[in-house]
Amino acid sequence: MIKLILLLGIITSLFAQIKDEIFIPITQQQPYNRQKAALGKELFIDKRLSKDKTISCETCHNLEIKATGTSDKITKDNPPTLLNVSLNFIFSKKGEIKNLSEQIKKSLTSDKELNTQESFIISQINKNPKYEAKFKNIYKDGVTFENSVDALTEFIKALNTPLSRFDKFLAGDKTALSEDEQKGFEAFIKYGCASCHNGINLGGNIISVMKNEIINTNEILKVPTLRNISLTKPYFHDGRVNELRDAIEMIRSRIHSGKHDEKECELIYKFLLTLEGNTPEILYE
């Protein structure tokens, strides 16, 4: 009995150490310039900035559903959420871009996205007197492509979702998660989910060779964040699964060979629901 108590104590201690070392809570909104972010929000939803004037950033990253990346699909890939993306240090599908502003530039000019050019964006902005006045008020050099990217960057910085129940738990509030949710977190670690989904965004900052069993490819892809996962369906890079429970089951059966049972899957599901943070204030403005 004494040995069992000691063993349980060691396991509890190791769990606490892992929790503290590989997960980082978001306890407050990342600082951003409100004027620039408000301007960036306008640019984000403006279809006139795309080559054929039919799509905007918001076409794929719908603000009405919290920029979760679940809007109309115009590419073969499942658009990722923009919530908390500013906290990442690698970007793009394969993680080759190391800077948020550079990712925005790519999204604006890529023929698979807005498919526009720097000069076209500047000309479209200059056609709108309200835009021109706002740029001159915020930036000394007025309307430039770099300033447009800067405004969009500030808007995306504003899309943090702090203080999820998991964040509160990490910060020391042991009552923030129920007993089942804590067991789900333990199972999440036990089965190696945290080996990819870790850090401040529980993913988003490492790349992995995806297994054939899941997505039929050996591509090196960026691991997605699990924050707000209950809001960001569909799942996987091509959006093949529409329900979170089904995504968990697919991983259980194909990666872990069914090692954990349905009860543990349900506990992990309950834990993942605790990753939903506060809606960014700028989405109400």
Located regions from the model:
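Sec-dependent N-terminal signal peptides
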Residues: 4-13
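Periplasmic c-type cytochrome electron-transfer domains
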Residues: 16-285
